[in-house]
């Protein structure tokens, strides 16, 4: 169990990408991590494909200094989550502490609003390529990769690669 003792937030809101959320949560738990689902309220939140998830806490309830990482799954949820300053502040605070930030698919929208993509390489859903580039990122069309504390994943079929990179980064941090 590579992540025993690690505390990791996974963001959730209505419209989350079911597999990007649930596979990542299960993979982190499988490695022994304490996973805290954070959303704008308790939920239940409904995924794009109708799976449900509940939040354990809101962003205001979580101390970035106690976290080893944060994950931003895709779907439509990132467009909602980026509107909550407490969410973008939490993402920025985790990044400022050089802790792992995992971003897949449309999760880059939250990273943009958190101000953490300028000058970095990034990937995600092709639908947000222009957003990432306009925010100062360099687009990289790869399934998943790591750059410093940022772990990027493209889309649903790339979840295995994303989770592999994410677990590796979290186990080193």
Regions found by a protein language model. Give the residues of each.
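Extended, subdomain-level signal for the structured scaffold at the beginning of enzyme domains
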Residues: 1-97, 101, 110-121, 129-173
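Catalytic nucleophile serine of serine hydrolases
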Residues: 105
């Amino acid at each position: 169990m590579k992540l025993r003792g690690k505390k990791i937030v996974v963001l959730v809101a209505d419209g989350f990408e079911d597999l990007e959320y649930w596979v990542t949560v299960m993979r982190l738990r499988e490695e022994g991590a304490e996973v805290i689902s954070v959303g704008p309220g308790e939920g239940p939140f409904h995924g794009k494909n109708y799976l449900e998830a509940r939040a354990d806490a809101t962003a205001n309830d979580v101390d970035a200094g106690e976290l080893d990482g944060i994950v931003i799954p895709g779907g439509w949820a990132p467009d909602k989550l980026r509107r909550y300053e407490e969410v973008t502040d939490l993402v920025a605070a985790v990044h400022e502490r050089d802790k792992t930030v995992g971003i897949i698919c449309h999760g880059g929208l939250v990273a943009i609003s958190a101000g953490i993509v300028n000058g970095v390489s990034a990937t995600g859903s092709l639908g947000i390529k222009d957003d990432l580039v306009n925010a100062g990122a360099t687009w990289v069309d790869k399934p998943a990769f790591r750059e410093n504390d940022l772990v990027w994943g493209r889309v649903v079929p790339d979840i295995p690669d994303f989770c592999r990179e994410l677990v590796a980064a979290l186990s080193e941090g």
